Amino acid sequence: MVAQYITTTGSYGNINNGNGDPEMIYLSPIEQTINKVTINSTPFANIVDTLHYVNITMPKSAAASLKVDGVTPTNSVVHPGDANFVYFQVNLRSGAHTIIADSGFNAIAY
């Protein structure tokens, strides 16, 4: 099991202008993917509405089938560890969001 840590703003080199809390995310292996998920970004007043994101990793061959709220993301980056995979970082507003693809993907919302 592999985990990714995000430090508190201002700590351990995290200098992103005052946004962010500590977080730990368990990374799912590529053998454990999903084809559809609905996530929710909180509308709480103390959360900056433009700072909601979802990171999506999937096979490059299936990237054209990916839709976030019915729209195909266009900002793919070839995964540095394996050129057969791509990575998307999609900015979200608060509310519910549906991610769907013909092939499996892994998604992390924050």
Q: Which residues fall in each region the model found?
A:
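Conserved functional hotspot residues at active sites or interaction interfaces
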Residues: 1-110
